[in-house]
From Swiss-Prot:
Function: Exohydrolysis of beta-1,4-linkages between N-acetyl-D-glucosamine and D-glucosamine residues, and D-glucosamine and D-glucosamine residues in chitosan.
Protein name per UniProt: Exochitosanase
Entry keyword set: Glycosidase, Hydrolase
GO molecular function, one term: hydrolase activity, acting on glycosyl bonds
EC number(s) on file: 3.2.1.-
Amino acid sequence: LPTGPNNPTTLDNSSII
């Protein structure tokens, strides 16, 4: 699941908690 620092729908696997 692509979860960004602010946007849970952004294509940025940075904050997967």
